[in-house]
Structures are given as C-alpha cells and as structure tokens.
C-alpha cells in the first residue's frame, strides 16, 4: 500500500511538471520557428551586422571609437550598441533600427552597470566583504530595475575573475581570492539581474566576464600574460564562471589575455570545448572592448585573420573592432569561415533578443515615465546605505576607541574626507557624482547640536601631479593648488583644537579599477607624510581607509589605534561611514582577500599548498623551509578577518558523525555567544582540508559560511552541512571527484582562528 501511495504521488508530481516542460518546449519551438523565418530573409551583410557591437561617445570606457553608426543601423549592420545613456536617446536609436532598417530587427543596448546604476552600491570587492548573498542579489535587482528603466537591456556584469594579486587594479570589480565565495556571489548576481523572467521589463541580460583567467595577469599588470596549468585554472579560477553559467547567465564576455598562449577571444578550446561542450552554455559570447583587433598585437595575424579565428573559436559578437562586419565575407569567399558558423553566431544573438522580449515590444525598455519614477529613488539609496555599512571591515580597535562619542571636537582630516566624486568607486559610469554623500557632510549632519566638526584636507592624493592625474580618469579631478606646507599647517592647526582625529585617506576611486595596477601598495607618499605629522600631535586617531583592493597597511597597523577599511561604499558612503563611526551600525564585514605585510609576499592567499618544507604559522625564519630572510610568511590580516564592536565566543564544534560516504552528508555545529555590549552580526566560516589525496591539496578551503545576527548575551547554534560535493576537486587528469580518506573540518571567525575536527570519507 505504501509503495502504491509513493507511485501515485510520483505520478501526480510528474503530471504537474509536464505542462511546464511542454510549455518550455513549445516556447523554444516558437522561438526557433521565428528565428528560422527571420534568418531566411537576411542577407550575409545583415547577419554579420547582428555580430557587430559599436560604441557611442556618451561614456568613455576604451580608446577606440565607432563611426557612421546611424547609417550602419539603417543598413542592418548593427546588432547592438553600448554606452548610450538616457531612455529618450535609446528610444530614438531603437526607432531607427525598427522603423528604418529593412528587417526591423531591434538592437541590444549594453552598459557596464557594475555596482548599481544611478543609485551606486559599494564596489563589487566591497560587496563581497559583506558575505551577504541576499543583499548582493538585491543590489543586482535594483541595478537591473534602474538601468532597464533607462533603456538598457544588457549589463556587462558580473565580473568573476579570481584575483590573488592585489597589484592588479581590477580586484575592485571582483569578489576576491576565493572560488567558493566567488561562486556564491556569481549565482546571486546573475539571479538578481535576470530574475525569474528575462522578458520582464525590469530584468536585464547578465554578462559573465572576463572569460577567462583575467585576474591571473602576471605581476598584477593589467592586460598582461596569463600562464597557468589546467589543474590550477579548474580548481581555483574557473568555478565562479561555471556557477554563473549554471545560474542561467545568457551572455559571456571574453578576456583580453592569452590562455595556453592563445588569446581568449580566439581560443576554441576555451570558448567551445570548455564553455559550450563541457559546461553546456547556450548563450552568446561577446568580446571585450576591441579584443579582436588587439589579437593582431598578440601576433596572430591581420584583422581578417584574427576575425576569422575569433568567429571559428566561438565568439559571436565583436565589440567595437568592426572585424566581423568588415572581413568575414572575404573569409567566407576564401573558405576560411563557413556560412554555418556565421548562422550559428547570428542565431545566438537573435535568441538573446527573443528571450528579452524585444521582438514583441522593441520599446519595452523605453518608458520615459518609468525612468522618472524608478531611478535613484529614496528607497534604493536607503538600501545602498544599508549594504555599505555591512561591507566595512574593522581591522583594529585598540582600547575600544570606536564607536566615537557624539561630543567634543572632532577633526576630520584627509584628501578623501570631502570629495563626493571619489565616494562611489571605479566603474560607476553614470553616477551622480556631485550628489554622493561625503564624510564631512554626513558627519556634520550626524553631530549637529552635539559636537563640533573641524575639517582640513591636509594633503593631495600624492605629490606627483601627473601620477595623480593618471589615477583620476572619468573626470574625478581632486587636486588642490595649495602648497603641501600650507595644507599641512592647516591640518595641524585643526588637529590641535580637537579631542580626536578621524583621518580619511587611501586610494582615490580610480587608483583601483581598469588600467590601475600598482607596484607599491602602501599609503601614497603625500598622505603618509600627513599621517606621520598627525601622529606626532599625540591625539587619538581613527584611520578611515579607502581602497579598491587589499593594500599594505603594516605601518598603519603599528601606529594607529583604530582602522576602519571602507573600500568605496557607493552614493551613500558618507552616511554609511558615519553610521558605523558613531555606533548606529556595528561593523560586520570580513576580508575576502588576504592583506599582506609587504608587497614582496604577493601573491599571498589563504588556500595555498603546504609545500614539502612548510614554515609553521606564526614562525619567523627557519633554515631549509619555505620562507623569507626578512619577513615571516603570515599576512597582516588573514582571509575572512574582521572585528566588531562586540565580542563573540565560539564553543567547541561537534560533528554529527566521524564518517561519511558518497551517498550521505554529515554536519558540524558550533555555538556562538555574543559576549559583548552590542547586538551584532557575525560571519561564521567553515573550511575543509583533504589530508591525503592523489594530488597536493590546499591547507584549507572555504566550504561554508553563515552571516548570523546575535543579540548581546545571546547564544546561537550554527550548523554547516558537509556534502560529498564539498570534498571534490580536479585531479591531475582533470577528473572532478573526491577520494576516500581523512579530512579536517575547521570552524571559526576567520581562516586563521579556527577549531579543527577530523572525519573520514569511506
């Protein structure tokens, strides 16, 4: 009888699923019929036009410019356009495509909506430090809502490049050094952008970038060579890309770098064998800015040769270079490209347009009333303020100097204390820069009638004016014409009057980001001298540090009692920073990249291999072990680290079982008690180590985390489930599997301060 009930239930479940499956098959059949009919009418030039993605001059994100765009649209020689700002402008251009081209095919409209649209959220690296997947997903939803209201239907995000070298400026755009956390964020971002229904007017097509391995650039120098084994790339660099594909991302952008000596844009193994055959990706592949043209500089031939190579490799859309539009017809005539290859690429782009619903309604993203109502709303800005406070990482708080009291005189000093243009961070291309909240403005508001705020800029970003100009693209100039002596005197006069100093220093927004690699990750020279002078006053100093990457703060750690890393917090930065400084919010962010003591330690990451001659953690030099003569191996701050205004005590973890098989899971539980004086959030972390395997395995790997709210005096139990999947890795033959044997599971507040248990996989 029980068996009959189970069978009956299964039959009912299958029946309930059948309409959904049938509907999906019916929808796909309709799409295929529609596209077949359309492509039967298209000329070769019109098909190549769908593969063409020129740029407008509204927003500058690269060197090359497109020409004669309107005429090309009329001739059906453009598939999409990017960097056009404003719903009315976009509607005008869409009208040209729909009403003046022969086949009336609507355009895609793309933009780098990286961390918000006009409502700007913290930079992606900062967001990752919140470890809050629902909040991160919500930022993507709001970004999609705003940009789609302004005519955009395609965002070149999320950026999923794992980075172990903070000299690389584009660490700011990613989620740090860990593939597990990066994969969780990839899923959240794609789901946030695309939603449950890509044809809805408030969702946009996501674009996974930069595929692949861009974050592995040698020496951290942007656009530089990448060279790594397949074993390393599949274990550490590929997982976030795959997670985004699994989450349904409909487009992928190629990276500038080589993979196995072949530029990614022309790499058939990467774009066809891995992305499509191994991972099952069905969407469209677009190049990065002029990436096809740049293959000539890589030494792969002239524009015709590299264009054919890219198309044959699996690239579908050419951004800016005009290589496909201008050369592929000749390559077809010469037998170097087949018509089938062109048709396949064209179909993928038309499928994306169909799924977005713009064949049904080309103007669905062009509602002017919606743009006025849904962009930069008070609700969206309030959420930006809320999530920003969750991303800040408290690195040091000696003597509980923070939170500050609302009394007395506070000296706010530094080049980033009152500069709205640098609050939103890199790649905030349509931000309302002048409306961004500054620390000075927000602090005056927070302390009105309670305490006095004294302000001085103190210094420029750096002494060298040209180098400062190089680091302030997108018009974010902040240089003061006064002499360094004049600015320093003003700062010291202000400091002497105050009870406490808040120093707002660090990187400007464009000192990190694209083409912003640095060899020296310490505080810029002018600001370092300012801090030295302020320290000599003897006043207590809170360091508020801005950066788009992990920086070297060894001197600051040794010399200042309190350090709050605020990264770049978006349009509401000033309010969010003051929320944390004055205790309205309790800092809860934790590092997603290891912070080194010296740039000479880089690359430095927590999930490293042990080597045959490891130096024990916390030890200095030991002959014939893997170490340095002049510094220990340990980071300044480990991965996962971050303090709070309260304190948390971890109990002893327990395992549900000491053994598991590939058909079951086990769990590890730990009690966490808030032993301090503030209700606060804690981010508990679980790491796994495979003690004996067929290849060398990392000393630990993140495999679980939970952000949990705990009231003061309260104890909560956090339970992590360990699955067979958590124990899998790519072996030397690139087989993804786990192996029987002994494992360690570690639980704690960061990657260093953990408690360890062992279990066996049978």
Question: Which residues fall in each region the model found?
Answer:
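Acidic surface patches and DE-rich sequence motifs
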Residues: 731
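Bacterial Sec-dependent N-terminal signal peptides
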Residues: 1-26
